[in-house]
Amino acid sequence: MPNSYFPSSVTSLHFIDCSVLELNQIHSNITILSLPNEFNH
């Protein structure tokens, strides 16, 4: 039982890691894109 559970938990952790990295990447892209707007105001 633990043996079959372990790989899936590792996989989901890895998936969460990737999602967080992707979100961070998107967020920094949005921040960069919105910088000129900040200066325009």
UniProtKB/Swiss-Prot annotation:
Going by the entry's taxonomy, the superkingdom of the source organism is recorded as: Eukaryota
Supply the name of the protein. Answer: Putative uncharacterized protein DDB_G0286937
Q: Which organism is it from?
A: Dictyostelium discoideum
